[in-house]
């Protein structure tokens, strides 16, 4: 293994990753699709510690697969890291790649959670997709990899249920 590198599991294979992130500090264009997006991972700075990382994307967008109209969501991703953590700029580019992707709310939300879990191999991961109403009905989608580790502090995701103007 090269000096300054670490091993992090990604998908079905072990990947040797440099300690230098792929995108951080670099000019990076938005991937054309989620399939083209590369998620980058760095070594967990606190291996062995039980803690949670939260990412919130309050202005997430994708496209309705039927009408082609934009759909908007507030995503909250929580995870207890294992050997590696997702690099935040890579995650931002991955999430941004959905703005021209057509998918149902359920597929988009669960797909994001499963890809992160499958590649990063955290101890635990959950995602909440709080979708804004289209056709008068808000849709909230929740997925988690399994029960959270005992002793992990799990704050509420902090997104109020949709109440409209009433």
UniProtKB/Swiss-Prot annotation:
Substrate binds at residues 86-88, 105-106. Pathway: tRNA modification; tRNA-queuosine biosynthesis. It is an enzyme of class 1 (oxidoreductase). Gene3D superfamilies: 3.30.1130.10. It is found in: Cytoplasm. One of its GO terms (biological process) is tRNA modification. It catalyses: 7-aminomethyl-7-carbaguanine + 2 NADP(+) = 7-cyano-7-deazaguanine + 2 NADPH + 3 H(+). One of its GO terms (molecular function) is preQ1 synthase activity. The active site is at 64 (thioimide intermediate), 71 (proton donor). The keyword NADP applies. Its main location: cytoplasm. It comes from the Bacteria. InterPro entries: GTP-CH-I_C/QueF (IPR043133), NADPH_dep_7-cyano-7-deazaG_red (IPR050084), QueF (IPR029500), QueF_type1 (IPR016856). GO terms for cellular component: cytoplasm. Signal peptide: none annotated. Its EC number is 1.7.1.13. Keywords: Cytoplasm, NADP, Oxidoreductase, Queuosine biosynthesis. Pfam families: QueF. Catalyzes the NADPH-dependent reduction of 7-cyano-7-deazaguanine (preQ0) to 7-aminomethyl-7-deazaguanine (preQ1). Belongs to the GTP cyclohydrolase I family. QueF type 1 subfamily. HAMAP family: QueF_type1. This is NADPH-dependent 7-cyano-7-deazaguanine reductase. The lineage of its organism: Bacteria, Pseudomonadati, Pseudomonadota, Alphaproteobacteria, Sphingomonadales.
